[in-house]
Regions:
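Residue-level signature of the transmembrane alpha-helical cores
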Residues: 39-43, 47, 63, 70, ...
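Interfacial helix-cap and linker-helix signal at transmembrane-aqueous boundaries
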Residues: 27-28, 113-121, 175, 252-253, ...
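Structural signature of transmembrane alpha-helices in multi-pass secondary transporters
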Residues: 13, 17, 68, 97-107, ...
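Loop-to-transmembrane helix entry/capping segments in MFS-fold secondary transporters
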Residues: 89-99, 260, 347-356
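Helix-loop-helix hairpins in multi-pass membrane proteins, especially solute transporters
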Residues: 26-159
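Transmembrane core module of solute transporters
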Residues: 4, 8-16, 122, 159, ...
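Hydrophobic transmembrane architecture of multi-pass small-molecule transporters
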Residues: 136, 340, 361-455, 460, ...
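Hydrophobic transmembrane-helix bundles of small-molecule transporters
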Residues: 97, 119-233, 240, 258, ...
Length: 466
């Protein structure tokens, strides 16, 4: 399997997912969120089973793209169902905290379970794992989850769907391409084209409202500073969080030499911090203004990265402790920001609003890889010193990434290997320090901005019902 095939296998899912989140959110409002959840779960389980036995790289790319379609059904449906079931503010926040904890637990357990499966079974077992997880959902959801939908849905607008799909695909492809090859003509042109289609989508929504035609997405929501502040806080925090996981996983596996399974286990305390902080803040947030809570959570982000920038990633204990502080900030900020986002819209539009939230998460994930990951890689390449006498091909490989340096060192051995690893580890740590300092400043600024954007929210956020 060539490198290009591997890239498409990885990227096809996120490309399709990001393109379809907003349309699927609107479809859920129209046909029913529970129905969309069941369709998405059934399709995701079925395609996962097929992907496990894909006979070629092309078929695996197609399977991953199909998983993106059904994944786009699942993500906004779950959050919008919470919006419609839980009216009481405290109960809704607890439900959101549990919902967010599921994603966090999945992110932490993924490397552990995936590493175990790949160590003992064929690669297809990773896809098969989704099947037994989704079967209980398919059995229990029709019994336990009530149906909800928009009683007056907007008419289907194929042009709006095409515009948002094309726009998000262009932006996501361009950013993903940037993380792999840098800002070249392809990346710049696709990002700009994507932004143009997004502008056309917004103009069409405004035009439909002007002509008293219900739009697919009420873009006027972004005039609400509380809604926009919550969405922006989620996007930026996700960007730096992904950046942390990006270099933490490399440190644990490449510098410390831990297998993926054990590296993932060291991240469990931080994941538990996310879960506990979310559940606790859901109950005590009633005593504080939402702006104070979100800003405090983002400030914890800034503090964690500031300490990491000062100390550097010299040992595993630093990584673990930093992730605990960071996880606490994640649990606090994202639980309340998601509640603010959901409460800012009427129940009938919960699907579309949830899709915007999920899109911000996906965009933040890509930006984390591009910006934080790109910064880390650039600093590494500027500081790593390759020993003299090394084969040119091997030298280039070692100069590209830390993983490349570790691979080359294992091949050459001896004093050259020791010199290369020493230089590579120092260069990588320099990248961690700079990217952490950047993240600390960014989150400090975001903590202040989010406070002023969200402070207009009432102390006890009541769901919009109009």
């Amino acid at each position: 399997m060539c490198i290009r095939d591997r890239l498409w296998i990885v990227d096809s899912y996120s490309l399709v997912l990001s393109a379809l989140l907003v349309p699927m959110g609107a479809i859920g409002d129209r046909i029913g969120r529970r129905k969309l959840l069941l369709i998405g779960s059934t399709g995701f389980a079925a395609i996962s089973a097929l992907a496990a036995f894909a006979p070629s790289a092309l078929m695996l790319v197609v399977a991953r793209a199909l998983l993106g379609i059904f994944g786009a059904m699942l993500m906004p449906a779950t959050l919008s169902i919470i919006r419609n079931i839980f009216v009481d503010a405290t109960e809704r926040r607890i439900a959101i905290a549990v919902w967010a904890s599921g994603f966090s637990a999945g992110a932490a357990l993924g490397p552990i379970v995936g590493g175990f499966l790949l160590e003992h079974f064929d690669w297809g077992s990773v896809f098969l794992l989704a099947v037994p997880i989704l079967i209980p959902l398919l059995i229990l959801a029709p019994i336990m989850v009530p149906e909800s939908k928009d009683p007056n849905p907007s008419p289907v607008d194929p042009l709006s769907i095409l515009l948002i799909m094309t726009g998000m695909t262009g932006i996501t492809f361009g950013l993903t391409h940037t993380s792999e090859t840098g800002f070249d003509a392809v990346a710049i042109s696709t990002i700009l084209a994507g932004l143009c289609f997004i502008v056309l989508f917004v103009l069409r929504q405004l035009n439909r409202e002007k002509n008293d035609i219900q739009p697919m997405l009420d873009v006027r929501l972004f005039r609400n500073t509380v809604f926009t502040g919550a969405i922006t806080a989620n996007l930026i925090s996700m960007m730096v969080d992904v950046g942390f996981i990006y270099f933490a996983s490399q440190h644990l596996q490449l510098v410390s030499g831990l297998p993926p399974m054990y590296a993932g286990m060291l991240l469990i305390p931080g994941t538990l911090a996310i879960i506990i902080a979310g559940l606790v803040i859901a109950r005590v947030a009633v005593h504080f203004h939402p702006a104070q809570v979100v800003s405090f959570g983002l400030a914890l982000h800034a503090a964690a990265f500031a300490v990491l920038a000062f100390l550097g990633a010299h040992n595993d204990l630093v990584i673990i402790l930093i992730f605990i502080v960071l996880g606490t900030g994640i649990g606090i900020a994202q639980t309340i920001s998601n509640d603010l986002m959901l409460s800012s819209v009427p129940p009938r539009k919960a699907g579309a609003a949830s899709a915007i939230s999920e899109t911000s998460y996906e965009t933040g994930t890509v930006l984390g890889t591009v910006i934080i990951g790109g910064m880390l890689t650039a600093v590494y390449r500027a500081n790593v010193v390759v020993p003299d006498g090394l084969d040119e091909t091997l030298a280039d490989h070692a100069h590209e990434t830390l993983g490349g340096a570790v691979t080359v060192a294992s091949q050459v051995g001896g004093e050259q290997a020791n010199q290369l690893l020493s230089s590579a580890f120092a260069a990588f740590d320099s990248g961690v320090v700079l990217s952490s300092a950047f993240s600390a400043v960014l989150m400090g600024v975001m903590a202040v901005i989010s406070y002023f954007m969200i402070r207009k929210a009432p102390r006890e956020m009541k769901p919009a019902d109009h």
